[in-house]
Amino acid sequence: AEGKIIEILGNVGDVGLEILSIIKQNDLPLEFPPQVIEASKRVPKSIKQSELEGRRDLRDLPIVTVDGDDAKDLDDAVYVKQLGKDEFLLGVHIADVSYYVKENAVLDKEARERGTSVYLVDRVLPMLPERLSNGICSLNAGEDRLTMSCEMHIDRKGRILSYEIFPSVIHVRHRLSYRIVREILVNGDEELAQKYEQLFHQPEAFLKLGNRLLVLPVPDEPPAEKPRTKPPAEHDR
């Protein structure tokens, strides 16, 4: 059998060589094609007032993201409020990527080809160019972002009483990490709790709801109740 060198990745001992070898062995794409980069440049860096039409404005809510310390593409955010002794409101907000990435367009085809973002020890191979994944499609703190939201009313046993899915616009107040949330809710860090007082004015609500949901089985079917088509009453938020 004969073989030939098709590419030299580096020298033995080079930093990152092992990771690069894994990338090559699995035929993972390192770069985006020029046409994909060009398409990403045509996507705006911020949203316009006209784009808010038909979306529910949730920018007044203290919504936060909770991710790893090194995460850059923040695609989901949450808000929770205890409505009464036996009921919580949980809002989950997902970046509305489909608003910017149209079906069968260049960006969509590239994302389908990649299938997912790949997280390695020293880098991330994103499904979309960083201008989108870390920019307008990332729920960065202090920025208005277009989202798809699901608001759920959950009882004290963790059962979903009702839910509603709708297009929205949010303004993330803080970028939290799992470490920060753990320090506040589990370890009782008073300094951090004071810093994020507005968000954790009901820390027991976060903790109680989190404990309920962690032990729930994942249902095969969504709740029987259909999503509401009208906005919830003001007291729901």
What positions do the PLM features span?
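Charge-lined substrate channels and their catalytic hotspots, especially those that engage the 3′ end
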Residues: 1-91, 98-143, 182, 198, ...
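Short, mixed-charge, low-aromatic patches
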Residues: 32-34, 105-107, 161-166, 209-213
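A glycine-rich phosphate-binding loop feature that marks nucleotide/adenosyl-phosphate handling sites
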Residues: 6-8, 167-169, 224
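Residue-level recognition of well-ordered beta-strand positions that form the cores
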Residues: 79, 91-93, 151-153, 212
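Conserved catalytic alpha/beta cores of large enzymes that bind or transform nucleotide phosphates
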Residues: 117-210
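N-terminal low-complexity segments that are often proline-rich with Ser/Thr-Pro
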Residues: 201-237
